[in-house]
UniProtKB/Swiss-Prot annotation:
Keywords: Glycosyltransferase, Transferase. Signal peptide: none annotated. Disulfide bonds: none annotated. Belongs to the queuine tRNA-ribosyltransferase family. NCBIfam families: tgt_general. This is Queuine tRNA-ribosyltransferase-like protein. GO terms for biological process: tRNA-guanine transglycosylation. It comes from the Eukaryota.
């Protein structure tokens, strides 16, 4: 059995390596899987939740998370790979206890000439109190499980759009890049690779800042308030017309 070989190797010269076990989340978890996890608990460092992160509905993914996480040990890292990985998917995964997330969102957008644009920083306590989850009469409370994963348009600036021909502002107000929208639009129109390099840099920076902000509010025990603030600030509560 493969895990037995892994156990032998880890007990010899690879004691510092990690063993990540892939578990399908789209099937009913039977006793074989739970027995395997229990038997090799000492060598399994993390669990990769496979079979999710594609085009499944919000309800399907939420149910899968709940089913699989109920039987997994709390002390194991949980991994997931998302074919998209937009901000709502990130918040949803962390909300359900996923530790490591591999998204494709920043790269996919850059490849297609698009930039991430979103409000990130809930700067003060007053903002946080406005979304206090203890107040049951608060209208600013949303269920992350009920939001549409695919409402990406709220986070995207499509620099292929001709409307940016004369727009000399930077990509976003919080971008690390100084190039203007009009310049990047020109590069895209000329099929210059530089445009995708600039957009990849921008998108990765924004996503890194996003994860840092999430980590900050988790440490401050304020993550649920941040979710509600993020939804409200980025107008994700509004239905598409």
């Amino acid at each position: 059995e493969f895990l037995e070989k892994v156990q032998i190797i880890k007990n010899t010269n690879l004691s510092n390596s990690l063993c990540i076990l892939s578990i399908p989340c789209t099937v009913d978890i039977d006793t074989v899987i739970t027995e395997t996890i229990n038997k090799y608990d000492s060598i399994i460092d993390g669990i990769l939740l496979s079979g999710l992160g594609y085009d499944e509905s919000n309800e399907t993914r939420t149910n899968a998370f709940k089913n699989i996480l109920n039987i997994l040990p709390n002390n194991k890292l949980k991994f997931i790979q998302l074919s998209n990985g937009n901000p709502i998917e990130i918040l949803h995964a962390i909300y359900h206890g996923i530790d490591v997330i591999e998204p494709n969102f920043p790269y996919y957008l850059a490849k297609n000439g698009k930039a991430i644009n979103m409000n990130l920083k809930m700067d003060n306590l007053q903002d946080g109190n406005e979304y206090n989850l203890q107040d049951k009469n608060n209208d600013n409370i949303y269920d992350i499980n009920l939001l549409d994963f695919k409402n990406d348009v709220n986070f995207i600036i499509d620099l292929n759009n001709p409307k940016y021909v004369l727009d000399h502002s930077t990509i976003t107000c919080n971008s690390p890049r100084k190039e203007s929208k009009s310049y990047i639009h020109h590069l895209l129109k000329c099929h210059e690779l530089t445009a995708h390099v600039i957009l990849t840099y921008h998108n990765l920076y924004i996503y890194r800042s996003f994860f840092q902000e999430i980590q900050l509010h988790i440490k401050e025990n304020n993550f649920l308030s941040y979710i509600n603030w993020f939804i409200e600030k980025n107008e994700l509560n509004k239905k598409e017309e």
